[in-house]
């Protein structure tokens, strides 16, 4: 597995675990103010990062693009900045607003980079796979 796919899948598990622990904590305390944070950690962190990672696993040539590395850092940093800002806002700290907005735009930028990486990967001819009939060798 290439390093980029691995980093995304590890980040997905970390974000998903944080989202689940937050959900469990909210259920135990009956304090659901951070429910939007729980949702974003699970959907943006766990699901989106897992999709990114599995895509880069399936298209290893796409993971070698410089834009793919930029995309990872935009996505990872954007998630942390956005979630920090969102948590602050939900706990009535207005100072979280610029962080939530900045993180949102970073996350959007990461998705647009991902689209660019995919377009570039789909435009490049893939190496032909030479499958031989059973019993024949090259």
Question: What positions do the PLM features span?
Answer:
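Hydrophobic alpha-helical transmembrane segments of multi-pass integral membrane proteins
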Residues: 1-138
